[in-house]
Amino acid sequence: MEETEGLDAEITDGIILSKKEIPQSEIEKLKSELGIEYLDSAFSEYILSYNWGNFGFLSYQFGYDDETSLSWLINRNLDYDEYPALRKKNLIIIANGDPYTILLDCKSGEIYAFTSDMTYEEIVTVASDFEEFVRAMGTAQYAVWKNAEKEFIESMEREYSESSLKFWKELVSVY
């Protein structure tokens, strides 16, 4: 990839999404252990096909040191004290960062962000689905690499509400 050409592999590890084949049985295990009936199919396809278990965008980490299973996703949710409240709302945690935690609505596929200061009624929609979220996060990371944060926010202003923009602005440090 041109953008990361010449960088030390230790730096690029975890910021380049690479193909991985994780068995479908991991989705069934995830659903069973988290007590969820349905998991958005687009999200399922992405997490079975790529190395989300060792990947992040900017300050947001999906998984860490787990490229062969979905244990990172199971543990992230089960270790969260308020997971039962999330499960009742069909939500799971898919990434953590500062200051937001990223949630997936298991049925609709919508992506939300919330902070420890928010109630679950105040969560903010940041993307209509996982693919849109990933594309926006990747674009944000590229904008930071190219010092084009303001241009990134200008493009996001055409797509997102003011409450969503707060997340995207904080992601690229534009206030």
Which positions does each model-derived feature cover?
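A surface-exposed partner-binding patch
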Residues: 1-102, 163-175
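Generic alpha-helical structural element
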Residues: 19, 32, 119-122, 157-160
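Residue-level detector of alpha-helical secondary structure
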Residues: 31, 131-134, 157, 169
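Extended hydrophobic/aromatic-rich secondary-structure runs
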Residues: 57, 127, 135-136, 156-160
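Short acidic-glycine loop/turn motifs at beta-strand connectors
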Residues: 105-108
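Compact, glycine/acidic-enriched structural inserts
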Residues: 113-146
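Acidic, proline/glycine-rich low-complexity IDRs
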Residues: 142-175
